[in-house]
Amino acid sequence: VLFRSGLGQREQDEELAVAVRTLKALAIETGVALVVTSDLPTVVAGRNDPRPGLGDFGALGAVKAHADIVLGVYREEMHSPGTGVEGATELRVLKNRNGGTGYVDLYFYKQWLRFEDMLDPDR
C-alpha cells in the first residue's frame, strides 16, 4: 500500500484500514483468496525469541483484525547463522478464524524457492 506523502502515522493507519476493508470486501465478493505480505519490525529480530507473534503486527492492526488467517514464518538460520538445521522453517498459524493455531515444520529448498513438509516430504 502506498501512502500519500505528508501523512502522519494516524492518517496512514486510517488509510491502511480502509484499504484492508476494501480488499476484504473484494475477496468476499469474488470468492478469491487474498494474500497480504508484510515485514515485521526489526525489534522482533532483537528479542530472545524472534518467532513472530500476532502482537508483532503493530501498525498493521487492520490486517490482523480483518484477516481470517494470519501466518508467520520463522527460519532459525536467518537469526542465528550456523545453528539449527539449514532450511528448517516453522510456519506458524497465528490466527485462524475457522480453526486452530499452532505450527508446521517445513523444509525450505532455496534452489527452487519451495517449502515442503519436513515430516512427510512425499505429501
Role assignments for model-derived ranges:
Residues 5-10, 14-31, 42-123:
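C-terminal regions of RecA-like/P-loop NTPase motor modules
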Residues 1-2:
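Short, small-residue-biased leader/transition segments that mark boundaries at the very start
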Residues 37:
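Conserved D-loop beta-strand region of ABC ATPase nucleotide-binding domains
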